[in-house]
């Protein structure tokens, strides 16, 4: 049988197509220099920026600099395991992290590996650590509240689901305490088993001491809050590359909940250390330094992270991701580079002051310069009813307070205003790890703003509040239930509340 040349060509093509070629070409380069967590690699001509490479020892690297004849990669782990002359291969992948509900209750590192000794995480879903933020069309306006359980915040600086609210202040002023209290306060919503009220929490520790992270884990476990919380830890002892990646990895975990119609809250503690880690990497990569030696793209570093916080439209599932970034200031200087950057990115800030903290006013929130730009739309009507002019009254009190040092030559109206201000400040104080329900907050603030506390000594305000809330829970539950269901104070309920407070104040003063 004679075959025509064209038939031979067809047969050969079919045979070639049927060959199962198992061998795969790998692009391999070589480490020509390594030090300070940076490896210079020769021979990876086609590698892309942001691609993951794998070193001979199994340690991963992230390519950040592309040059004519070499590339620079940050080592995602111990740089002692990478030696000059080691082979490096391309993975043709970008950084991914495990996501899903299986992560709840776990402590993981910046790459999503468990570090709590509780075994592997049973999740098969991965997500890229840098996803594009939702567009304008995919978003909805902020309309539902995130209840922190902290009176001064829920009343005066309300936070909505999908908002980005900065917590800023000097070291040791209670920034982390506010974040942890907010996580603990979500426990009640999780116990009610209504998915639309639940908020899943993610806490990212960047550049902190391991002992501090261990304390936070212990506190959340004791409060029963770890069941709905993920902790991502990139401590001070870990590579700068891991501290740089940690917030993005945690954000991807939060985006999983947001994109599946659920609600998540993410706390970045803190972004000052994140910027320092990025500055370290940039300087080692020999990128040009700018103001305070930070690289030129340090604004974009945080803006692309915080833009992922959003309230999604109903067409996209109606989920949300709320961000609470934390920034540490030096001697109260909010005009420094990183603080001003993050203030301009976020939708408001809670400013904590050392002076107030040392005076015993805790949480040490400076109400005058703290603001929530979009949260008021999410605040329930009952809160707006009791808040009234409290911000103005507190500002006037702060102004009049300075006159106290000049003695008692003040008119009776000014004295009365100062006494009222002192009681407002006292009623807004709150112990750590002691969140209040919305109804309890409303009752307490109502008593303060309507001047029911004027005859009660300042040092007994806390005792009065505890006894009043205990009494109302036992004998006037209908007042609390009405506020909870109506989300406002009805005329009938207000009358009941007035009668209760008048009688309770009389009895309290009489016992005194």
From Swiss-Prot:
Positions of ATP binding: 169-176
Entry's EC annotation: 7.1.2.2
Keywords: ATP synthesis, ATP-binding, Cell inner membrane, Cell membrane, CF(1), Hydrogen ion transport, Ion transport, Membrane, Nucleotide-binding, Translocase, Transport
PROSITE patterns: ATPASE_ALPHA_BETA
Keyword Transcription assigned: no
Family of this protein: Belongs to the ATPase alpha/beta chains family.
Quaternary context: F-type ATPases have 2 components, CF(1) - the catalytic core - and CF(0) - the membrane proton channel. CF(1) has five subunits: alpha(3), beta(3), gamma(1), delta(1), epsilon(1). CF(0) has three main subunits: a(1), b(2) and c(9-12). The alpha and beta chains form an alternating ring which encloses part of the gamma chain. CF(1) is attached to CF(0) by a central stalk formed by the gamma and epsilon chains, while a peripheral stalk is formed by the delta and b chains.
Organism of derivation: Rickettsia bellii (strain OSU 85-389)
Membrane topology classification: Peripheral membrane protein
Compartment(s) of residence: Cell inner membrane
Reactions it catalyzes: ATP + H2O + 4 H(+)(in) = ADP + phosphate + 5 H(+)(out)
CDD domains in the cross-refs: ATP-synt_F1_alpha_C, ATP-synt_F1_alpha_N, F1-ATPase_alpha_CD
InterPro entries, per database record: ATP_synth_asu-like_sf (IPR023366), ATP_synth_asu_C (IPR000793), ATP_synth_asu_C_sf (IPR038376), ATP_synth_F1_a_nt-bd_dom (IPR033732), ATP_synth_F1_asu (IPR005294), ATPase_a/bsu_AS (IPR020003), ATPase_F1/V1/A1_a/bsu_N (IPR004100), ATPase_F1/V1/A1_a/bsu_N_sf (IPR036121)
Protein name: ATP synthase subunit alpha
GO cellular component, one term: plasma membrane
Biological role stated in the UniProt entry: Produces ATP from ADP in the presence of a proton gradient across the membrane. The alpha chain is a regulatory subunit.
